[in-house]
Amino acid sequence: DAAKNDDRAAMVMANTWSHSAPGLMGGHKSPGMTLYFGGLRLLQRTPEGVYFADLAACNAFEAGPVRAEAVTCPTLVVLGNEDKMTGPKQSRAVAGSIEGARVIELDCGHAMLSEQSNAVLAALKTIV
């Protein structure tokens, strides 16, 4: 309801759930910077109604398992072990639906590109 009503509390909740414990406590490689407030500011720049539409589309998508089973190319699933938005269990289930998929688990939350950008890059280099 918060996202539907453009209540910024929805963004605060999602941003909190997107970061690992270290990411919530600063976690930025540059002194004086914070991952949490950087992520929140990005969400706050979203035009009215767009954030809710994004969440609603994710929530309504039900073809994931069928689509995953149809994947035939080499696949790498990169997951964050502290991801509260798309939990590790769900990510492993997707990987399990794709024949031959590999999983790399990183020490981060959903915001893996801000928390562990070099580790994400290293993971991607293993498949390209």
Question: What residue spans do the PLM features occupy?
Answer:
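Hydrophobic alpha-helical packing elements
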Residues: A10, Y51-D54, V94, L113, ...
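Short beta-strand/loop motif that positions the catalytic acidic residue
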Residues: V71, V77-L79, D83
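Short alpha-helix in the alpha/beta-hydrolase fold that links the catalytic acid
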Residues: C73, G87-G96
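Residue-level signal for the nucleotide or nucleotide-sugar donor/cofactor binding architecture
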Residues: T46, T86-K89, E115
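Catalytic active-site module of serine/aspartate enzymes centered on a nucleophile-bearing elbow/loop
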Residues: E99-V128
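Conserved alpha/beta-hydrolase catalytic His-Asp/Glu region
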Residues: A2-E69
